[in-house]
Amino acid sequence: MKKSFIYILTLAFLLLLSSCGESRQTRIARTRAEYEKQMRENRAALKIGALPTLDCLPLFIAQDDSLFKATGSDIRLKMRNSQLDNDTAFIGGSLEGMVTDIKRLEYIEKKGVGVKRVATTNAYWQLFGNPMARIFEVKQLGNKMVAMTRYSATDFLTDVALKGVKTQGMVFSVQFNDVKLRLKMLLNNEMDALWLTEPQATQARLFGANMLYDSRKAGFHLGAIAFRQKAWDDETRKKQITDFISAYNQAVDSINAHGISRYGKIIQKYCGCNDKTVKALPKLKYQHIQVK
């Protein structure tokens, strides 16, 4: 009787091990299948690169208010803190579109990538001096470091701001691409001057940073939304892009009707700023994407 019991117990244990093994194999197969499915869906989706800046606000609203979803197209935002990270993905084809600036697009085109620019955004850039360094004017930037991004609006604007200005020494343009890191360097007294757009520019003003130059002073409109020409010409992408534009324009209408303050929570979520910053933001108007 005892031997029979041991035999039954051993058999039950072996069956349990066998079932566990099968279960593990099944789980591995299912995980692999799910991963491959996710990859296929991601490749098929329209992927748009965005930054934690207010020129991307219509995209954030279209995402969180389900305007993209309502179109029936799979439209996905890919958030990054750096223009260069978006550019790399755009050039490599893992993004179909992105919010960027005209100078970056010119650089990308020189790399041999076809680009279709569909809109100019309301982005502007302001140059701030470190209040700890007591920098109040552009002419004080001699022998100082200015944080910017190479071959971008901020690189171009550095030259514009310094044109005809006599400084006591060379101005050192240093590359810091992460917009959040750039702001932290100001707050931590690690950079003499730097370019910021909204809402980081408002955060800098609240910190007491001195604005040295505003891109709007020269009438520049450098913000842009663009798609890869290859994606633009692709028949399978046409509906997705049309749906993206429709959702974007709906978000623009809502912002212009109600003001950006209505979307404070969304701004905080995507841009990482606090309620004080949201309340101090300037009034901004947005334009439709109008493709000719």
Tell where the protein language model's regions lie, with residue ranges.
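Periplasmic-binding protein-like
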Residues: 121-131, 206-237, 241-245, 283-288
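Sec-exported extracytoplasmic/periplasmic mature domains
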Residues: 64, 91, 110, 163-167, ...
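Proline/Glycine/Serine-rich low-complexity intrinsically disordered segments
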Residues: 132-139, 163, 169-171, 183, ...
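C-terminal motif of bacterial Sec signal peptides marking the signal peptidase cleavage site
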Residues: 16-19
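Secondary-structure end/capping motifs
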Residues: 234-292
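Sec-dependent signal peptide recognition
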Residues: 3-10
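Short, glycine-/small- and polar/acidic-enriched structural segments
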Residues: 23-176, 185, 192-198, 211-219
